[in-house]
Every structure is written in C-alpha cells, then in structure tokens.
C-alpha cells in the first residue's frame, strides 16, 4: 500500500498521516484534521484534493471527507498503526487489533450499500448530519415526497433507534412523508403502531 501510494504521489508521510486520521471515521471534518495532524488547513485541502483525484477520498458533506476505497480504509484503520505487531504476532493480530473494532468499521460500508440501493429508487439522495451526531439519508421521489432513511440499526432496529431519529427531526423542525429503515434482522413490531409509515428494507433484498 505504501509503495503504491508513493508511486502516485510525493510526500508519502503526509498522505499517510491524513489517511490514518480519516480511517477511524471520527476525524473527517477539516477542522478535526487540522487539530489532529497539526498541518495547516490549506495544506490539508491540497492533499485532500489530490486524494480525491486518486479516488481514495470523497467529500460526503460540506467540509467532511471519508476514505471511499474499502481496502485503503482497512489498511489505514487496522494495519498501518500496528505495522510492527503485524509482523510479530501472527494470528493474534486479528484478536487484539481488529475483532472488537470491526463492527464499527463495517458500518460505513453498510451505509454505502444502502446508499446504492436508495440511488436506484429515488430522484435525489443526500446525507443529513444531524445535530445529535447521527448521519441519515434524505431522499426525494419524483412526486416531491420526502423520505428520511435510517441505516443505523444494522442488527435489529429498535424503538431506541427510532426515538433518536425522532429527536433529531424534532430538533431541526424536520418533517417527512415516510421513514425508511435499513436493518439486517428486522425491527421491533411496536414501531409500526405509530402514525408515520415505516418501511423496512434488508440489504439483501432485490426490490
């Protein structure tokens, strides 16, 4: 990975630092990268532009960036920070450095799968970064109907997940014609008793 990146760009160490900062998914904002790396905002912006041209990074929200290549993100999330351990600990490496964090790592990939499904069904699909710190999708149909989409309940969507969504919408005075939920293993049946229509879509559905 480092060899390939060095062939495509100069100052590999700077790129490595920026990619490692982005890899955990918590420092994607420009100000966070500035605080985390110590590089100037102007320098970070230049390197981000180059990484986007290489199709390694993309801007997902105003001022917010993510690694869009899953292999690159895996490398900088799990392997790059522990290169010495990678060579010396063998099979124990996974148990020590990957297993507990892997579900969080998968969530971004899960979101991208959901986004691809939505882009095939709706006229527009945008990300909404709520003030509660959760990210949702905002979609519109050709008729103008607005759909709020929650992909966060990847195991089983619960009433707690729904309450967080409702609080986020209320805080920002947002309304929706329908709410769409992505979930791997269903949802609490009591959720269908509300006044808002809730649709459930598993990522393995073809419809």
Spans of model-derived segments:
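Short, surface-exposed connector motifs at secondary-structure boundaries
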Residues: 26-29, 172-176
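Hydrophobic beta-strand segments of well-ordered beta-sheets in folded domains
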Residues: 145-148, 175-181
């Amino acid at each position: 990975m480092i060899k390939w990146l060095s062939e495509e760009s100069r100052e590999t160490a700077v790129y490595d630092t920026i990619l490692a900062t982005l890899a955990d998914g918590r420092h994607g904002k420009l100000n966070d990268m500035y605080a985390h790396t110590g590089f100037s905002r102007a320098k970070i912006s230049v390197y981000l532009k180059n990484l986007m041209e290489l199709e390694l990074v993309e801007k997902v929200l105003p001022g917010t960036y993510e690694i869009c290549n899953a292999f690159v993100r895996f490398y900088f999330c799990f392997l790059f920070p522990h290169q010495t351990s990678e060579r010396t600990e063998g099979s124990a490496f996974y148990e020590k450095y990957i297993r507990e964090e892997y579900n969080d790592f998968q969530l971004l990939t899960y979101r991208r799968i959901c986004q691809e499904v939505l882009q095939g069904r709706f006229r527009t699909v945008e990300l909404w970064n709520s003030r509660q710190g959760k990210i949702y999708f905002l979609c519109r149909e050709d008729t103008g109907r607005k759909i709020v989409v929650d992909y966060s309940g990847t195991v089983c969507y619960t009433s707690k997940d729904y309450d967080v969504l409702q609080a986020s919408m209320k805080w920002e005075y947002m309304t929706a014609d329908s709410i769409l939920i992505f979930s791997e293993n269903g949802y609490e049946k009591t959720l269908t008793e509300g006044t808002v229509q809730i649709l459930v879509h598993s990522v393995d559905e073809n419809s």
